[in-house]
Structure formats: C-alpha cells, structure tokens
C-alpha cells in the first residue's frame, strides 16, 4: 500500500520538470510569433506609400527609414540601382553597404537606415524607393552568430512595405523667380486692400463732414 502511494506521488513530481521545460520552450516562441504579428500589422498600415518632395539644386535631402522595428531589413533604390543595403561579404554585418556606382551623391545612414542626398542636381530628380523585407530576426542581433545572420538576410526576399519618395529638383533661378512672383502677388494684394480701405473711409467720412458743416452753418444763421 505504501509503495502504491509513493508511486502515485512520484508521477506528478516527475512531471513537474517536464512541464517547466515545455513552458520555458513554448513561451518565447509564442511571444516571438505575437511580436511578428504585431509588426506585420504595423507594416501593412503604410504599404506602398508615395511621398512627393520638391528641393532646390544644391540642397541636402534626408530620407528617413519607414516603420521598421529593428532597422535591419531596409534597402534603398534609385531606379534599378541599389543605393543602400546589406552586404553579405562584409565581416561586420551591422554596417550598411553603399553602392558607389550609382549616380546621385548620397550617403547611407547606418544608425537610422535612412538615406542622405547631398548637393543634388537636376539629374537627381526621380523616385527613391525604400523597400522593407520580412526577416525573421530579433531586435537584438547579438544573439546570432555571423553566419546565422547572413542566412537570415539571404531569406529576406518578400517585400511587405515600400515608400517611394518622388523628388523634383528645381534650379535656384526657378526658385528665385517663384519667390519674385510670390512677392509681386503679395504687393498687388496689399495695394488693392489699401485702395479699398481708403474708399471705405472716404465713403463714410465725407457725408459726416458735410452734415457737420451744414449743422454749423444753420447754427450761425439762427444766431444772426
């Protein structure tokens, strides 16, 4: 009888470590899947956005990365030329790759995964598109070794978000002409408003002045 009781007690005790191991294994997986689902909904809110921008020749333009939770899956393109992206051949995988063969003068911002265009010319007008790829990466990449990260980046092949910045570069002369036109229109508007105000003042004040003169003349005649 005593042996049967001990056996019944040992079975739940033996199951406790198994339950703890299962919980320790399943909870991180469930949390990770929940986080992925949240980011997926976040990305879909701004999928395929177009943002028009007008700048003057010689300006510097900063293009921020869109909502990308860990900033490890953004790639920038100008036409068919990849400006910024991840280079699998770099030993330090936390740095952005800059493709110097592309025509605009630009710099890839490693900290924000954004793009900076400097000293823009008229030829730099066009679409600059940021593609965000789905990568099964945690926010802390130090948990992966180099080869694991490169394998993950090789599998980042599904675009879930893209932002197209349509940049129009205008010449400084055009900008000055525009400012001149704005100033001219503002001057004409001020002149018209002034004329209207003078007309209103004259219209209301002249009859009042005449009435005052007539009243004064009548008073003089009565006294006489």
From Swiss-Prot:
UniProt entry keywords in alphabetical sequence: Glycoprotein, Late protein, Membrane, Signal, Transmembrane, Transmembrane helix, Viral envelope protein, Virion
Glycan attachment residues as annotated in the record: 71, 92, 99, 110, 119, 123, 140, 157, 161
InterPro entries found in the cross-reference section: Ig-like_fold (IPR013783)
UniProt-annotated location(s): Virion membrane
Membrane protein topology class: Single-pass membrane protein
Signal peptide: 1-25
Residues annotated as transmembrane: 186-206
GO CC terms, sorted: membrane; viral envelope; virion membrane
Statement: the UniProt record of this protein carries the keyword Secreted: no
Record family assignment: Belongs to the RL11 family.
Protein name: Glycoprotein UL1
Lineage: Viruses, Duplodnaviria, Heunggongvirae, Peploviricota, Herviviricetes
């Amino acid at each position: 009888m005593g042996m049967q009781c001990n056996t019944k007690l040992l079975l739940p005790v033996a199951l406790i470590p198994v339950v703890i191991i299962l919980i320790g294994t399943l909870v991180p997986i469930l949390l990770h899947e929940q986080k992925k689902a949240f980011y997926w909904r976040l990305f879909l809110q701004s999928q395929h956005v177009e943002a028009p921008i007008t700048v003057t020749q010689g300006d510097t333009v900063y293009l921020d990365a869109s909502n990308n939770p860990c900033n490890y899956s953004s790639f920038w393109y100008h036409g068919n030329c990849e400006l910024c992206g991840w280079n699998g051949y770099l030993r330090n995988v936390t740095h952005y790759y800059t493709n110097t063969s592309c025509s605009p003068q630009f710099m890839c911002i490693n900290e924000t995964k954004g793009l900076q265009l400097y000293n823009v010319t008229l030829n730099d007008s066009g679409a600059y598109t940021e593609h965000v790829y789905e990568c099964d990466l945690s926010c802390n990449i130090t948990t992966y070794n180099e080869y694991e990260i490169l394998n993950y980046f090789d599998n980042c092949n599904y675009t879930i978000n893209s932002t197209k910045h349509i940049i129009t570069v205008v010449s400084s002369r055009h900008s000055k002409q525009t400012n001149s036109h704005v100033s001219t229109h503002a001057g004409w508007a001020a002149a018209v408003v002034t004329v209207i105000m003078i007309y209103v003042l004259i219209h209301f004040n002249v009859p009042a002045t005449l009435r005052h003169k007539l009243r004064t003349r009548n008073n003089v005649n009565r006294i006489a």
